[in-house]
Swiss-Prot record:
It comes from Xenopus tropicalis. PANTHER family: GEO07735P1-RELATED-RELATED (PTHR13531), TRANSMEMBRANE PROTEIN 17 (PTHR13531:SF14). Transmembrane component of the tectonic-like complex, a complex localized at the transition zone of primary cilia and acting as a barrier that prevents diffusion of transmembrane proteins between the cilia and plasma membranes. Required for ciliogenesis and sonic hedgehog/SHH signaling. This is Transmembrane protein 17A. It comes from the Eukaryota. It is found in: Cell projection, Cilium membrane. It is a multi-pass membrane protein. One of its GO terms (cellular component) is ciliary membrane. Keywords: Cell membrane, Cell projection, Cilium, Cilium biogenesis/degradation, Membrane, Transmembrane, Transmembrane helix. The keyword Transmembrane helix applies. The gene is tmem17-a. One of its GO terms (biological process) is smoothened signaling pathway. The chain crosses the membrane at residues 49-69, 82-102, 114-134, 146-166.
């Protein structure tokens, strides 16, 4: 019996080292106290800062995009007119959803929302912005290049930061799951 308890302690120590190496403790170690609903949430401050600035920059980008579209609308072929209007609507909807998912996923440490933010950023928003920046048929104006470039820079900075925040949140939740399983086994 004492040997089984020693093996259990060794396994417990090993799993704590593997799963909880860089995760803050959410319950007191070896206390046997019941786990309360309170948990430590550790959002990424750098991601939150860039989301904050992006939320304030997006209306400015939108107004500039609409003004530039109105200025060059008569010069564009019909298919580019259609593409640019659809892109404006699509990017506006995607950006609002993306910022909401980023805020809620980061602040509340919700992994699905943070993953959705990453996927929307990488798969939809970045290709659309690169199309607006790089297609010469759109006849981009200098102001357009500048505002699209700034939004692309925000996006290129947010993508790796959000991936690291997602990894951190996943590790944190895995550690909490491990602790819950460990506490249930002792009761």
């Amino acid at each position: 019996m004492a040997q089984a308890a020693g093996v259990r302690r060794q396994l417990d120590s090993l799993t704590r080292n593997i799963f909880l190496r860089d995760v803050g403790r959410t319950v007191p170690e070896k206390s046997g106290a019941p786990l309360t609903g309170d948990s430590e949430v550790a959002p990424s401050v750098s991601l939150q800062i860039f989301l904050y600035f992006n939320a304030f920059y997006f209306p400015f980008w939108w107004v500039c995009y609409v003004i530039m579209l109105q200025l060059k609308y008569v010069l564009l072929p019909d298919y580019y007119k259609f593409i640019l209007v659809v892109l404006l609507i699509l990017m506006s909807v995607i950006e609002v959803i993306r910022l909401y998912l980023g805020y809620s996923g980061n602040l509340q440490e919700k992994v699905p929302e943070l993953a959705g933010f990453c996927l929307l950023s990488i798969l939809l928003q970045l290709p659309l912005l690169l199309f607006l920046l790089c297609d010469p048929g759109l006849e981009p104006l200098p102001l357009e290049r500048a505002v699209h470039g700034i939004l692309t820079a925000f996006l290129l900075i947010q993508i790796p930061i959000s991936i690291f925040a997602l990894r951190k949140a996943t590790r944190h939740l895995a550690g909490r799951f491990h602790l819950l399983g460990d506490l249930d086994g002792r009761a």
